[in-house]
């Protein structure tokens, strides 16, 4: 299976659909952002949040080169504050960023989850690839008033386009 189709398969499996508004938290250079923006289409919106200006610049160049106009970049200082209104997104991607490297303290991760909870519509999902802390992440997310709805296991793409078997956990608000 080619790289791009594996990414699309994973995103569709976690619930991304045409017309949705999705936040890719810690989007990096856009491995999942670009395909997610293609799935949500022109009626949808993809917020790409990262603290690295260079990777956001790269992401926006890629988006422009493929004609995508539905991606909005969001630079952050790394604080767990998301500059979106309450109940404004249908889904949040939290792929390989919810771990102690980026958020060393449990309280930091809890503040991130509280912000995500705030911006999620009542029916929204949060999709987490807890690459570096699988069991701990599940417990922390459930303790933040989310419940595990489903799991997706398949080939996922990591830094430098490395393919690896992984598991994505999908949660919803309680």
Kindly give the residue locations of the regions a language model identified.
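Conserved alpha-helix/loop element of class I SAM-dependent methyltransferases that forms part
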Residues: 2-20
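Class I SAM-dependent methyltransferase SAM/SAH-binding core
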Residues: 23, 29-80
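A short glycine-rich, Lys/Arg-flanked "PGG" loop and its adjoining helix->strand segment in the class I
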Residues: 37, 106-122
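A short acidic, Gly/Pro-enriched loop at the edge of an enzyme's catalytic core
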Residues: 79-92
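A short beta-strand submotif of the Rossmann-like class I SAM-dependent methyltransferase core
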Residues: 94-97
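Conserved beta-strand signature within the Rossmann-like core of class I S-adenosyl-L-methionine
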Residues: 123-130
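Short alpha-helix
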Residues: 133-145
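Core SAM-dependent methyltransferase catalytic element
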Residues: 145, 157-174
């Amino acid at each position: 299976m080619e790289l791009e189709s594996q990414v699309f398969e994973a995103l569709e499996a976690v619930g991304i659909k045409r017309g949705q508004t999705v936040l890719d938290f810690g989007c990096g250079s856009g491995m999942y952002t670009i395909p997610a923006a293609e799935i949500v289409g022109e009626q949808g919106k993809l917020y790409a949040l990262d603290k690295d200006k260079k990777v956001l610049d790269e992401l926006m160049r890629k988006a422009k080169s493929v004609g995508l106009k539905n991606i909005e970049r969001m630079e952050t200082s790394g604080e767990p504050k998301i500059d979106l209104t309450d109940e404004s997104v249908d889904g949040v991607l939290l792929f390989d960023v919810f771990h102690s490297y980026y958020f060393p303290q449990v309280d930091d991760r809890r503040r991130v989850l509280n912000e995500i909870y705030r911006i999620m519509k009542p029916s929204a999902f949060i999709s987490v690839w807890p690459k570096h802390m699988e069991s701990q992440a599940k417990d922390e997310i459930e303790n933040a008033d989310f419940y595990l709805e489903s799991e997706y296991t398949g080939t996922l793409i990591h830094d430098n386009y490395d393919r690896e078997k992984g598991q994505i956990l999908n949660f919803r608000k309680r």
